[in-house]
C-alpha cells in the first residue's frame, strides 16, 4: 500500500473528523488506479483505445482531475496522493486544484454543521396515563406512571 497500512485500516480510519465522502472517493480512485493492469485482455489497454480503471472516456478521472498516460503504461507523475489519510504527512503538491477543492469542501461542511446545530428545540409532552388496548379496541388496563 505504500504507507504500511492494511485495507481494513483504510476502511475504518483513525482520523474520523477528517474522513469525508470526498476523501473516500479520492482514496478509492487512487488506490484502485495504482493496481497494475491485468494481462487477461492485452488489447483493451489505453494504447488500444480501451479505458483505464477510474478514467472516463475524455481522459478525466472519476473525480475530475485530468490524467494522461505516458508510453509504456506509466501513470501521471503529478498524482497528488497515493495513500489517502493513512500517511502521517500527506504527499501533496501544495496549491494544486485538488487542495483548493478540499478547502472549499471543508468550509461547506462547516456551514452545514452549523445549520444542524441551530435547529429548533422541540419539547415532547408525555401523557401520564397509558391505555392498553386489546385486539377488539377495548381498554383493558389503565396504568399510571
Curated annotation (Swiss-Prot):
Residues 27-120 are annotated as: Disordered. One of its GO terms (cellular component) is cytoplasm. It is found in: Cytoplasm; Synapse, Synaptosome; Membrane raft; Postsynaptic density. Coiled coil: none annotated. Pfam families: BAALC_N. Residues 3-35 are annotated as: Interaction with CAMK2A. Keywords: Cytoplasm, Lipoprotein, Membrane, Myristate, Palmitate, Synapse, Synaptosome. Residues 108-119 have a biased composition (Basic and acidic residues). Residues 83-106 have a biased composition (Polar residues). A lipid is attached at residue 3 (S-palmitoyl cysteine). A lipid is attached at residue 2 (N-myristoyl glycine). Its main location: cytoplasm. Expressed in the brain. InterPro entries: BAALC (IPR009728). Palmitoylation and myristoylation target the protein to the lipid rafts. Interacts with CAMK2A. PANTHER family: BRAIN AND ACUTE LEUKEMIA CYTOPLASMIC PROTEIN (PTHR14731:SF0). May play a synaptic role at the postsynaptic lipid rafts possibly through interaction with CAMK2A. This is Brain and acute leukemia cytoplasmic protein. The gene is BAALC.
Amino acid at each position: 500500500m505504500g504507507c504500511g497500512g492494511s485495507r481494513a485500516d483504510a476502511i475504518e480510519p483513525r482520523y474520523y473528523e477528517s474522513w469525508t465522502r470526498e476523501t473516500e472517493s479520492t482514496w478509492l480512485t487512487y488506490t484502485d488506479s495504482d493496481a497494475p493492469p491485468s494481462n487477461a485482455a492485452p488489447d483493451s489497454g489505453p494504447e488500444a483505445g480501451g479505458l483505464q480503471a477510474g478514467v472516463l472516456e475524455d481522459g478525466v478521472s472519476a473525480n475530475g482531475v485530468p490524467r494522461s498516460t505516458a508510453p509504456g503504461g506509466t501513470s501521471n507523475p503529478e498524482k497528488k496522493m497515493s495513500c489517502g489519510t493513512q500517511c502521517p504527512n500527506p504527499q501533496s503538491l501544495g496549491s494544486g486544484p485538488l487542495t483548493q477543492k478540499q478547502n472549499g469542501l471543508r468550509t461547506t461542511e462547516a456551514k452545514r454543521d452549523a445549520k444542524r446545530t441551530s435547529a429548533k428545540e422541540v419539547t415532547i409532552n408525555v401523557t401520564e396515563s397509558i391505555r392498553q388496548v386489546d385486539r377488539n379496541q377495548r381498554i383493558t388496563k389503565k396504568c399510571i406512571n
